[in-house]
């Protein structure tokens, strides 16, 4: 999310995963499972965009019931931050929009209204049956982790029936490190001659990536703890 007036983006993890919202492209069509991990979701955005799918940016749609009870990005639920308390600069089609009907919302944001209405009909039907026939949202254990167990039959799907309706714009982004300090198997930082620099250790995201590709959320935590342990062993000379 690109928040007006903020230099840094906002990572969407929980908000797009909980029930009561769905995400569409310019044509008003869904293109991915919103409740899956953020890496796979953004990968879908890139893959579909390369095929000509206008899904970058994409648009998270939710209704007043969702707005009342759940936060969305920096926007707190309406019970804590009513619309009157939302910064005026946030009300911009490039970030946050509101309208009494889906048709009006689509016009404000620039989404195909017919496609959006058809998508909402499908999402509402899936929320009744508990089965997302398009992208299997809620079938996976990861999906359900951020779902709401009080919502039945699928903790990741809830109908959108109460206006006004809202739209939050989502952009693909990159979260990680490029480059970093080179270390050896004792977590010692190496110089340009691949020799350890005395007294200098590093671990985690400040070092060169150990893996050629990011396999999923939290994958840097294990190496960070392991090399922190190895650094402590080398510093203390302990054999444990």
Where in this protein do the model-derived segments appear?
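Residues forming the flavin
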Residues: 1-121, 125-240
